[in-house]
Amino acid sequence: MTKRTLTMLGTGYATATRYYNTCFTIKSDGTTLLVDAGGGNTILNRLEESGTPLDDIHYMYLTHAHTDHVLGAVWVMRMVMQMSRNGVYGGVLHVYGHDKVLSVLEWICRQTLSTKFSALIGSVVMLHEVEDGDSFSVGDMTVTAFDIHSTREKQFGFRARWSDGTTLVCLGDEPYNEATKPYAENAQWLLSEAFCLYADREKFKPYEKHHSTARDAARLAASLNVQNLVLYHTEDKSPDTRKATYTAEAKSEFSGNVFVPDDLESIEINSPKHQ
């Protein structure tokens, strides 16, 4: 059986200081997909600490253009361009995203990187615009992008599928919209934001910020008939208790497996028959 690993490079919300911003890798059959890159060059440290060399990354997916998701991608691209010029990065970095996020990314790169680097956009770094429902291949994964129908910022989640039937769905970092049900229902793995505990909703005001709680995510997972729930994009005021308290709140509403990973924690993505 092919080993598949989800590694959370960061698990925090936009202004977290105790965690890095939410971003992760999916490694499968020798191929690595980087999903978002956080808000700065800490992404380089996180990749290094997770044992992911930059020259192993040839695919990146960006959900949206908020600073805590896209600015780290500038650093990834800059380093790939530099390594390519030095002859230590082979091949191409393929970056997938919707029109808005790719436009923002390219503009920042062309405004802030030297011409010797930005000139490599279109050769060493290829930007691939995806629309709602488009699919593309990353190694042995088929990735389908979908619009999460955010009312705040255009954002795409995705559904990854393997030939053995394993499915992993990323809902982005905003509350679930019923329009995305065809992509999320019956997934083996569901990645959902949980800004805080429902018990702490008065303290953190998640709903006013277009976010949800651990209890909300768990109820959603149960209603969508998923098997495994991964919570991320959280507040950072409870690092010593987060795993236990978020897991307990989610478990009270969802009978499947609940994961509340720390930064740099890896989770093995098993196929349905190995759950």
Predicted segments, located by residue:
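Divalent metal-coordination and catalytic microenvironments
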Residues: 6, 36, 47, 64, ...
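Metallo-beta-lactamase
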Residues: 89-154, 251, 259, 263
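Cap/insert and terminal regions of metallo-dependent hydrolase folds
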Residues: 175-266, 271
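Active-site metal-binding motif and surrounding structural segment of the metallo-beta-lactamase
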Residues: 41-94
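Conserved beta-strand hairpin/beta-sheet module of binuclear metal-dependent hydrolase folds
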Residues: 2-50, 154-172, 189
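Active-site neighborhood of phospho(di)ester-bond hydrolases with catalytic His/Asp-centered motifs
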Residues: 35-38, 57-65, 98, 168-172, ...
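Active-site-proximal loop/helix segment associated with metal-binding centers of metalloenzymes
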Residues: 16-18, 129-199
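Short histidine/acidic/glycine/proline-rich micro-motifs that form metal-
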Residues: 14, 67, 95, 101-102, ...
